[in-house]
Amino acid sequence: MYGGDEVSAIVVDLGSHTCKAGYAGEDAPKAVFPSVVGAIDGNGMDIDDAANTTEDAKESDKEKGKRKLYTGSQALNFRRDQMEILSPTKDGIVTDWDMVDNVWDHAFRNCLMIDPTEHPMLLAEPPLNSQQQREKSGFSTFYRC
């Protein structure tokens, strides 16, 4: 039975410890995973690294510039030489937008298994977020979705 208020809006909360994503109107988020990203600089990657990655890690990795980024519990728990665990936020403010895009992409594509262009989006943000951070967040979400 259709209640009339059922929309397929996606709610994303990128916290300093965990990222939570799910559908608006549901009691609990569908995806809860660490909001940290594993990063390997371009000079730290070797040929054997690509052969040792699991299928889940390959799906959630993204190469940005000269570093390879890994997001999600399975990708982070897989041992890789010279991988550094980094947080995209500091004191609740986003400091690395490439990492945030990687976290959002993991939430949409791997956890929720949706195309973000087909859903309205609600992003949680810190109450003391600056206007510049708010604009960057909206810009990034608008152009990637």
UniProtKB/Swiss-Prot annotation:
Expressed in roots, leaves and flowers. Signal peptide: none annotated. The gene is ARP4A. It comes from the Eukaryota. Belongs to the actin family. ARP4 subfamily. It comes from Arabidopsis thaliana. Residues 47-66 are annotated as: Disordered. This is Actin-related protein 4A. Residues 55-64 have a biased composition (Basic and acidic residues). Gene3D superfamilies: 3.30.420.40. Coiled coil: none annotated.
